[in-house]
């Protein structure tokens, strides 16, 4: 049956110090793959769809013929925008489970679409997922980031379509056991903002960012 599925692998080293690593990936099962033409260049990178194929060479959740971003620390916000999610060099951004199921090759997904996807995948819509006491006028950004040094902080830039209004808060989904909660600011976690320059956000850690 066509749909979105996940596969996970767990490896444990039984040496003196037990270490465990677990990886998970999502994949889409289709009745038939779309025909790729040598005359079509869907992502506009100068290479035909047929030549790029269905692979996901950089493992970011976007097939090669639809992916014109080489840098692993960049991810498209939406398919109709040039705005890019950005993390530090050396890290990797990957579409989250809901963004991957949304099949738009970008990290932005609406709350309504999340509910629809959960229904289509026959998952239970728990209170932890449906943050119904809040509205999300700027949408939900679903992604994972890897490659950062453990216990160290790193910068993540999320370009927004409009300025942040007074009273708006940044919330983060912490998994099914915790659910949604406001982003906790402390010595290691801080929110910054800056005006876009030529519709582009300053680089991560730029001095152009101010607190809040």
Give the ranges of each region predicted by the language model.
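Surface-exposed, short loops/turns at beta-strand junctions within beta-sandwich domains
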Residues: 2-3
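An exposed acidic His-Trp-rich patch
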Residues: 168-212
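Predominantly extracellular/luminal regions of secreted and cell-surface proteins
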Residues: 78-120
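Extracellular fibronectin type III
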Residues: 19-23
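Proteolytic processing hotspots in large secreted/extracellular or virion-associated proteins
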Residues: 121-177
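Extracellular calcium-associated, cysteine-rich motifs in secreted modular proteins
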Residues: 26-89
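Short, solvent-exposed loop/turn segments at the edges of extracellular beta-sandwich modules
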Residues: 11-18
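Hydrophobic/tyrosine-rich beta-strand signature of extracellular beta-sandwich/beta-rich modules
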Residues: 7-9
